[in-house]
Amino acid sequence: MSDTVEELVQRAKLAEQAERYDDMAAAMKKVTEQGQELSNEERNLLSVAYKNVVGARRSSWRVISSIEQKTEGSEKKQQLAKEYRVKVEQELNDICQDVLKLLDEFLIVKAGAAESKVFYLKMKGDYYRYLAEVASEDRAAVVEKSQKAYQEALDIAKDKMQPTHPIRLGLALNFSVFYYEILNTPEHACQLAKQAFDDAIAELDTLNEDSYKDSTLIMQLLRDNLTLWTSDVGAEDQEQEGNQEAGN
């Protein structure tokens, strides 16, 4: 007998508390595949699960890539590092494809409210961005898909959501990171981040009490990135790990 949605959600919550994010993602994938529109709680559980699952691989990939570069001159060590990097890349690729399939087949099409649509399109932009970080052959196509999803989300967010809404702010944060890291256009990244920050500051009185903490945190991250990027415009060797991203 298959688990009910309630049981799967409870399983996901248990897995989160135990920090077993692969189990959490597997449970929320099953919830999504039931074909019903997710509640806000379910949506956030899905996002947190996959963010942690993919985040672990992104972190591993960066470490291994760095080791691979440092082993130049030792052919055997470099080959071992390369093989391990390719293994992690495949895992990362599989996870991203899983998420993108859920988004295209279930989540985006079922999203009724503008908030949900923006959330899922931002997520689509994020996971294509993660693919772009490690892609080589089809990178241009992946980058284009990421930019298209982010832009569609931003168009809806600007039309339907307050500038202080945490999802709109998180979208601006991650889209600006995309411009900085993936397209290597710091001026565009700064412009997008500054616009989002300024728009939110101008409408601070619209801050929802429930999301006050989330909104102000993301505004701080936008400002942190702006500080980092404006000091870095013209410099070529900035470590990308310093760039802040939105959690969900």
Curated annotation (Swiss-Prot):
It comes from the Eukaryota. Keywords: Cytoplasm, Nucleus. Pfam families: 14-3-3. It is found in: Cytoplasm; Nucleus. Gene3D superfamilies: 14-3-3 domain. SUPFAM superfamilies: 14-3-3 protein. One of its GO terms (biological process) is negative regulation of gene expression. GO terms for cellular component: cell cortex; cytoplasm; nucleus. Interacts with daf-16 and sir-2.1. Interacts with atgl-1. Interacts with hcf-1. Belongs to the 14-3-3 family. Required to modulate lifespan, in concert with hcf-1, acting redundantly with 14-3-3-like protein ftt-2. This is 14-3-3-like protein 1. It comes from Caenorhabditis elegans.
